[in-house]
């Protein structure tokens, strides 16, 4: 199928390169307790065999991060990690993954005395030192409060869009270009709208598409297809 695509820049994530006309990469995630190394490795191998180019692993604590090192050694897969609320875990996980995802809204919760710009510069530095790409992962349920309060309660898209654009601008400013962006909502119509608006503003940035809290089949499949096929 010949899909119309924006002329985005190339972003290397481990052995995979996205954007710039490269094949669309598929990412899945494990549903195991990360500290159960055997089960997590088994699931990563199964996902890779099924066609996943990247696999996201949950890391919510330092113990998870320690398990990640062994998981990476055993599988050799292109791993991605979501930092959740503790962005400082980046320096622990970065040596073992191909991509780090951070949520701009979650940066607000940890070390509140620091400006978000300082935190992003730290993340970009860690990523660069460890040959990692990054994903700026904006989510409707956890938008930066400073952005959210600027808009009406019924407008969930504008604060997400502003947040993503601001983070892209900062990463551009400091010269970190190995990043993609995701803008997710549980409503596929909102996903379509916010991603189209972002792509119009930043056609150079590769998109990571997804529907948050999509749910189990068949509902999850239906929501995802609606969002992806527009």
Sequence positions of predicted segments:
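N-terminal amphipathic alpha-helix/helix-capping segment at the start of soluble metabolic enzymes
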Residues: 1-29, 128-130
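Active-site mouth loops of central-metabolism enzymes
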Residues: 13, 20-39, 58-60, 77-85, ...
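Hydrophobic faces of well-ordered beta-strands that scaffold small-molecule active sites
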Residues: 24-30, 53-57, 77-83, 100-102, ...
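Glycine-rich, proline-tolerant flexible connector loops at the mouths of alpha/beta enzymes
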Residues: 31, 36, 49-75, 104-112, ...
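Short, acidic/polar
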Residues: 35-46, 85-91, 164, 221-228
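Alpha-helix-loop-beta-strand connector modules within alpha/beta enzyme cores
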Residues: 62-83, 119-132, 196-205
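Conserved anion-binding
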Residues: 105-177
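Catalytic alpha/beta core domains of metabolic enzymes, predominantly
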Residues: 147-230
């Amino acid at each position: 199928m010949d899909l119309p695509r924006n002329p985005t820049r190339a972003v290397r994530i481990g052995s995979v390169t996205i954007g710039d006309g490269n094949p669309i990469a598929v990412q899945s995630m494990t549903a195991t307790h990360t500290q159960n190394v055997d089960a997590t490795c088994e699931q990563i191998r199964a996902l890779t065999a099924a066609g996943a180019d990247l696999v996201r692993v949950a890391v919510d604590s330092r113990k998870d991060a320690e398990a990640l090192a062994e998981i990476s050694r055993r599988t050799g897969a292109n791993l991605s990690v979501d930092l959740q609320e503790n962005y400082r875990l980046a320096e622990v996980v970065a040596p073992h993954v191909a991509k780090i995802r951070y949520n701009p809204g979650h940066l607000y919760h940890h070390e509140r005395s620091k400006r978000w710009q300082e935190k992003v510069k730290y993340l970009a530095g860690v990523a660069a030192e460890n040959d990692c790409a990054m994903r700026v992962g904006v989510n409707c349920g956890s938008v930066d409060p400073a952005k959210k309060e600027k808009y009406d309660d019924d407008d969930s898209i504008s604060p997400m869009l502003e947040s993503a654009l601001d983070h892209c601008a900062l990463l551009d400013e400091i010269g970190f270009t190995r990043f993609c962006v995701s803008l997710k909502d549980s409503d596929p119509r909102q996903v379509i709208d916010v991603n189209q608006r972002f792509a119009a503003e930043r056609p150079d940035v590769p998109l990571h598409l997804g529907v948050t809290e999509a749910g189990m089949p068949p509902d999850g499949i239906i929501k995802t297809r609606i969002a992806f096929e527009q």
